[in-house]
Amino acid sequence: WFPANLCLSVNDCVVHWIPDKYVLKNWDVLKIDCGVNYNKWISDAAVSLVVWWELANPLGQALIVATKSALDRSLEYIHNWNSAYEYSRNVLTVMKNAWFSVLEKLTWHWVGNYVHEKPHIYNVPDSSMKKVQLKSWMVIALEPITAVKSRDFFCNEGNWRNLYTEYWDLWAQWEYTVLVTDDGYEILAGLETL
């Protein structure tokens, strides 16, 4: 059970911040993560942005652009019979080349009648992921979750929903719900332009 359809996480809060009375300020990095249940089928999508983009800090902008690029450039590895490892390996490579980190213990996942269906696949690859093969008609939520420096996170004040970067640095996320097809993929949900 989750208490909201919309999570609005700000600055160093990585995921799952439920909207409250916080007033956004110029230069805040905001992640909007939304799940939709339509006829008992779930879609999940997220986007990151900097409040007042034109005046924003260049570090936040660069992190967001790199994160979206990691997702978009890794989509070529989403196709029938490819392993989950290849997608995650490419996400990590793109982020390292941009001098940013990937939060190691957060995952992308299958979706269907529930928002987080198994298996959950880490954005940082390990050899066990080579056994997880993508197959046509699988629906997956691809979501690189990145940070300026942090690779880990913690729960603040015992609240399992609000996860914060280990160094209190900026983070970003971009997420698509994707259908695996015989010859590639189809994006079902998610903002494709920056």
Language-model regions, residue ranges each:
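Active-site neighborhoods and metal-handling regions in enzymes and metal-associated proteins
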Residues: 1-194
